[in-house]
């Protein structure tokens, strides 16, 4: 068999796997670098957060090996159950959740915490993909069929906003609309939903003083650099110090608790300070290449009528792209802060578990697509 023929029969996406491994490697290095100061302050252990990150990474790898063996047909059949479990977990958060910085988003399992909001993304997208398998024609021809998945998203949004978690709600909203667009819903159906969504976001911002402060500080952070603009000004200072090539790995000053949440929501700022604009550009290029591979895998699955797999893969690509744009946009002062992680790079156990599960689903979808083509060729 010639080399080109051997590549044709490769039954997994090697590019996707290598990109993911690269991003996880960058994430591990940056979490070690950014979390040392806060680790020393909280536990007198500079590697406290690095150890936890490594634990979650190991757990994610084990979970991924299990997930890889589950056929996509099983995910389709279990999508409603996954959504139901997610709804129950979100309710439990409101009843017995742990509060951090005024937000109740975590369930405690001994010394570990899980964030059901992260699971809500994958659960909703699995459910929507399953819904589109059954009701694609109804979505295209009937406004009620279009509104049903929006209703499910709104139910999740209500529970998430009670935590509160507007950032996750925006990810769910944008990705849901994008999936319906890919399902060829009529443009006029989107107009009232988008209008209502914009109005709802404006009202939510007005209703909470801390959200208003985020918007005003985003518009002019230098007006109050030691008050409501403190976080953003320090983020911009980090980018400014990094310039093109950065100060060198480990040489950030802003991570010494000038910039809070340096290892989570604002890790991109420290990445820019230590590795420069070049380092940020490389990391973003890798994330968007992962998203592009997801969309490509989805397109190929749809082409051979694997509808559930195709829509799920596309939703993962849209999710990663939008979340990355919001995270980097907030760190660079182009968007108000939303509390979303930078995929695979920010510290966050629940985020790591869910996003690596999503990657494994992409690999499984691609495997089934390639296998179906190979079997058709053999026949």
UniProtKB/Swiss-Prot annotation:
Q: Which residues cross the membrane?
A: 16-36, 53-73, 80-100, 114-133, 140-162, 166-183, 187-207, 270-290, 302-322, 343-363
Name of the protein described by the UniProt record: Probable peptidoglycan glycosyltransferase FtsW
InterPro entries per the record? Cell_cycle_FtsW-rel_CS, FtsW, FtsW/RodA
> Looking at the UniProt record for this protein, which Gene Ontology cellular component terms does it annotate, in alphabetical order?
cell division site; plasma membrane
UniProt topology in membrane: Multi-pass membrane protein
Q: Name one Pfam family in it.
A: FTSW_RODA_SPOVE
Q: Which residues lie on this side of the membrane: Cytoplasmic?
A: 1-15, 74-79, 134-139, 184-186, 291-301, 364-379
Species whose genome carries this gene: Moranella endobia (strain PCIT)
Family from the record: Belongs to the SEDS family. FtsW subfamily.
Identify the metabolic or biological route this protein is part of.
Answer: Cell wall biogenesis; peptidoglycan biosynthesis
Q: Which reaction does it catalyse?
A: [GlcNAc-(1->4)-Mur2Ac(oyl-L-Ala-gamma-D-Glu-L-Lys-D-Ala-D-Ala)](n)-di-trans,octa-cis-undecaprenyl diphosphate + beta-D-GlcNAc-(1->4)-Mur2Ac(oyl-L-Ala-gamma-D-Glu-L-Lys-D-Ala-D-Ala)-di-trans,octa-cis-undecaprenyl diphosphate = [GlcNAc-(1->4)-Mur2Ac(oyl-L-Ala-gamma-D-Glu-L-Lys-D-Ala-D-Ala)](n+1)-di-trans,octa-cis-undecaprenyl diphosphate + di-trans,octa-cis-undecaprenyl diphosphate + H(+)
Say if the entry is tagged with keyword Transmembrane helix.
yes
Gene Ontology molecular function, alphabetical: lipid-linked peptidoglycan transporter activity; peptidoglycan glycosyltransferase activity
Taken from the record's topology, the Periplasmic segments are 37-52, 101-113, 163-165, 208-269, 323-342
Q: Which function does this protein serve?
A: Peptidoglycan polymerase that is essential for cell division.
Point out the gene that encodes the protein.
ftsW
Q: Which key words are in the record?
A: Cell cycle, Cell division, Cell inner membrane, Cell membrane, Cell shape, Cell wall biogenesis/degradation, Glycosyltransferase, Membrane, Peptidoglycan synthesis, Transferase, Transmembrane, Transmembrane helix
The record, for PROSITE patterns, names: FTSW_RODA_SPOVE (PS00428)
Keyword field contains Membrane: yes
Root EC class: transferase
């Amino acid at each position: 068999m010639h080399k080109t023929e051997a590549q044709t029969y490769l039954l997994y996406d090697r590019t996707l796997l290598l990109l993911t491994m690269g991003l996880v490697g960058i994430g591990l290095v940056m979490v070690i670098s950014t979390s040392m100061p806060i680790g020393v302050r909280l536990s007198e252990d500079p590697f406290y957060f690095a150890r936890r990150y490594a634990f979650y990474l190991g757990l994610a790898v084990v979970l991924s090996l299990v997930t890889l063996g589950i056929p996509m047909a099983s995910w389709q059949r279990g999508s409603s159950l996954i959504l139901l479990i997610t709804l129950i977990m979100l309710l439990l958060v409101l009843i017995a959740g742990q509060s951090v910085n005024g937000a109740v988003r975590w369930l405690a399992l001994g010394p570990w915490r899980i964030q059901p909001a992260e699971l809500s993304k994958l659960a909703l997208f699995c459910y929507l993909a399953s819904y589109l398998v059954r009701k694609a024609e109804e979505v295209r021809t009937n406004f009620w069929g279009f509104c049903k998945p929006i209703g499910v998203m709104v139910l999740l949004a209500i529970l998430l906003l009670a935590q509160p978690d507007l950032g996750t709600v925006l990810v769910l909203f944008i990705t849901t609309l994008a999936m319906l667009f890919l399902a060829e819903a009529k443009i006029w159906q989107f107009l009232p939903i988008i209008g209502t969504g914009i109005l709802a976001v404006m009202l939510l911002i007005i209703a909470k003083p801390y959200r208003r402060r985020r918007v005003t500080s985003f518009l002019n952070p230098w007006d109050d650099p030691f008050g409501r603009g403190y976080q953003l000004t320090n983020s911009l200072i980090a980018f400014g110090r990094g310039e093109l090539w950065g100060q060198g790995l480990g040489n950030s000053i802003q991570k010494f608790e000038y910039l809070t949440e340096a290892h989570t929501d604002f890790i991109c700022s420290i990445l820019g300070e230590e590795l420069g604009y070049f380092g940020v550009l490389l990391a973003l290029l890798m994330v968007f290449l992962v998203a592009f591979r997801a969309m490509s895998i989805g397109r190929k699955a749809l082409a051979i009528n694997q509808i559930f797999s195709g829509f799920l893969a596309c939703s993962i690509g849209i999710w990663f792209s939008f979340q990355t744009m919001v995270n980097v946009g907030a760190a660079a002062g182009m968007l108000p802060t939303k509390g979303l992680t930078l995929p695979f790079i920010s510290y966050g156990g629940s985020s790591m578990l869910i996003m690596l599960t999503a990657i494994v689903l992409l690999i499984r979808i691609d495997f089934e697509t390639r296998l179906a083509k190979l079997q058709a060729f053999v026949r």
